[in-house]
Amino acid sequence: MTFTLRRPAARVVLLDRAGRIFLIHAEDPIDPHKPDWWEIPGGGMGWNEDSGAAALRELHEETGIPNVEMGPCVWVQQTEYDFAGYHFESDDRIHVAWCDGGDYDPQ
């Protein structure tokens, strides 16, 4: 049986000063046969958490990139996906942000 989790989420389109977009290469940790994918950083929002604050927190947790200038929410969407044995129904708030760039190797 698959559980459904419905949650608000905040995500970030992160651009460096050269206009490059930062993407995360992801895979499902419990389904090795599922194809991998590229995504923008982000995740679930805390109770009463502002979407900009949540986007910045998730960006830092997932990438560790310093000195980020967070911009406004530029898009709102509803998504559904399966990940790690759960079915997610997510209300996403997409923010834009900028960083100085550089070579990053988040783990």
Language model regions located:
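Residue-level detector of high-confidence beta-strand sites
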Residues: 24, 73-76
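Short, charge-rich amphipathic segments
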Residues: 28-32, 76, 80-81
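N-terminal strand-loop-strand
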Residues: 1-39, 67, 99
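Unchanged
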Residues: 44-69, 77-107
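Intrinsically disordered regions, especially transient/low-confidence alpha-helical propensity segments
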Residues: 34-35, 44, 72
